[in-house]
A protein has these predicted regions:
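Short amphipathic alpha-helical interface segments
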Residues: 2-45
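A local structural micro-motif
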Residues: 27, 58-59
């Protein structure tokens, strides 16, 4: 996945916005799952891509398989630059 803003899908942008708004959690594992507002995202492949691209990360270390609040990395903030707040 490219981290260039023009290369992100609308779904990826919406997921990043949810993380930025503090509404998302990551399941800590080698393939981190994402849930928003307590519900699993329908596109976990994109969630994995966002984590592996270094755009999102958990706010704290937890045991493997446990959930932690998600936050944007510096790269994640840069990727959202230029997109309006409303999805």
């Amino acid at each position: 996945m490219s981290t260039h803003p023009n290369a992100l899908s609308r779904r990826a942008i919406a997921m990043l916005k949810a993380v930025a708004e503090g509404r998302a959690e990551l399941r800590c594992s080698c393939e981190p799952d994402l849930r928003v507002d307590g519900l699993s995202c329908c596109d976990q492949n994109t969630a994995h891509d966002l984590a592996h691209a270094g755009l999102v990360r958990p706010t704290r270390l937890v045991a493997p398989g446990q959930w932690a609040p998600a936050e944007l990395t510096e790269a994640g903030h840069r990727a959202l630059t230029g997109f309006p707040a409303a999805a």
